[in-house]
Design a protein with these regions (language model features):
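Alpha-helical transmembrane-bundle signature of multi-pass membrane transport and export proteins
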Residues: 2-433
Length: 433
């Protein structure tokens, strides 16, 4: 779930005829159902910015979580990918995807709504947040895989790169505007109440998804045992050298990213002294990295091939990870310069992640037949995010034992090694399609 079309929307006053000409020239945007699906993605990305800030802020500032507890929270959020990733692929290949997406979104909305309720009842605890994080992760496992497969159904394989670029533009807009909005809401209302805004977004999104008219054909009933289907998904990925390479590279990236996720709020608040408001502002500026990447991803894929674009993303994100532990507490003796440095770091990490994942998703779906597409997506998600709980727990342990900055330093070293391994140890640069 990641474009100039967002810019078009903001300048409608220049003439509806001009916009209609642009839309008519865009085969993806001519599809009303894609536009509805994209709108729900916009709501999801903006709402996610609130939760990404508010949930860890609840843990760090309200419940005084330790680095180990933050690592455990991040691990619980990613654990469902390991537990449910493979079975979800069987479910997707046996079910229509849109109802699965809607059920997953409803489950996440209920979990999020429990946070302000528990806070109001004075029952909010770290274990409660563990449970909420686990439910949110479970919803994302099934719903996220279903969204990728349903998008392929809506636009076809030929429209995937263009559609993914538009989703990247959505994320870029959310990453530029959303964090500032989220930081302001958390600062003004408190983290639990701010989460309610995301719940409202889920409700609107569900109502919008009900308006999608395209109906997937019901997959033929399967007489095989679910375990056999899981084995077929694993075998398909394993027997495709390209998918196998993508799986281990993405698994290593997720291990590092979830380690960073476990520690970055602690680092920003307790080491750098940032408030939720300044964190939101820094992340808002850093979100320009996603915007830059969404504009670069198609030219890079044309020039370097899809695999080359993936490698560029690895290197750019590694550069961002390497900068994190180098941020001083008071750069040039000023907290303002420290916030600016933090924003620059987020810029590079987000830019690299987008440059990596847009061609990564498009490439793996191009080489997969429809019959196993759901199992492939779920298998890849399960394999690649399986390392995430380990990364979060390791980072939390390193932060607890040696300090948050030292833990982030280990993540930086791992990111540099991964980028070098991707460039010199794989044949991704040869993947042109």
């Amino acid at each position: 779930m990641f474009s100039n079309n967002l810019c078009e929307i903001t300048i409608l006053s220049f003439g509806n005829n001009w916009l209609q000409k642009r839309v008519s020239a865009d085969s993806v945007m001519r599809k009303p159902d894609f536009r509805r699906f994209w709108f729900s993605s916009i709501l999801a990305h903006f709402g996610a910015q609130i939760t990404l800030l508010a949930l860890p802020i609840c843990a760090v500032l309200m419940l005084h979580a330790t680095p180990a507890q933050m690592g455990t929270l991040a691990a619980f959020e990613s654990l469902p990918f390991l537990l449910f990733g493979l079975p979800s692929g069987v479910l997707l290949d046996r079910s229509r995807r849109l109802p699965v997406i809607m059920c997953s979104d409803l489950m996440v909305a209920i979990a999020l709504a429990s946070v302000p309720l528990a806070w109001w009842l004075d029952m909010l605890t770290i274990p409660w947040l563990y449970a909420v994080g686990f439910v949110i992760g479970a919803g994302h496992v099934v719903g996220g895989s279903a969204e990728q497969v349903f998008l392929t159904f809506l636009v076809g394989r030929d429209g995937l790169v263009d559609a993914q670029a538009k989703f990247a533009a959505t994320e870029s807009a959310a990453r530029v505007v959303g964090p500032g909005m989220a930081g302001g809401l958390v600062q003004l209302l408190g983290a639990p109440i701010a989460i309610l805004c995301n719940v409202a977004g889920f409700i609107i999104s569900l109502l919008n998804l009900r308006r999608i008219r395209a109906r997937e054909p019901q997959p033929p009933p399967s007489t095989s045992h679910p375990m056999r289907d899981i084995q077929e998904g694993l075998a398909f990925v394993w027997n495709q050298p390209l998918l196998r390479t993508l799986a281990w590279v993405s698994a290593c990236w997720h291990l590092l990213f979830y380690g960073y996720t476990a520690l970055h709020v602690l680092f920003a608040t307790r080491v750098l002294g940032m408030t939720p408001g300044t964190m939101g502002m820094a992340n808002m500026l850093g979100g320009l990295g996603v915007l830059a990447a969404s504009l670069l991803v198609k030219p890079l894929s044309r020039r370097l091939g899809t695999g080359g674009g993936i490698l560029v993303g690895l290197c750019v994100s590694a550069f961002g990870f390497a900068l994190v532990p180098a941020i001083p507490t008071a750069l040039f003796g000023s907290a303002t310069w420290t916030v600016a440095a933090y924003a620059i770091v987020v810029f590079w990490i987000d830019c690299g992640a987008t440059l990596f994942f847009v061609p990564y998703i498009a490439l793996r779906q191009r080489v997969t037949p429809d019959a196993v597409l759901g199992r492939m997506v779920a298998t890849m998600r399960a394999l690649t995010v399986a390392a995430a709980p380990l990364g979060a727990l390791l980072a939390g342990g390193l932060g607890e034992g040696f300090g948050v900055r030292a833990g982030l330093g280990c993540i930086a070293a791992g990111a540099v090694l991964l980028a070098a391994g991707g460039v010199f140890g794989t044949r991704l640069k040869e993947a042109k399609e």
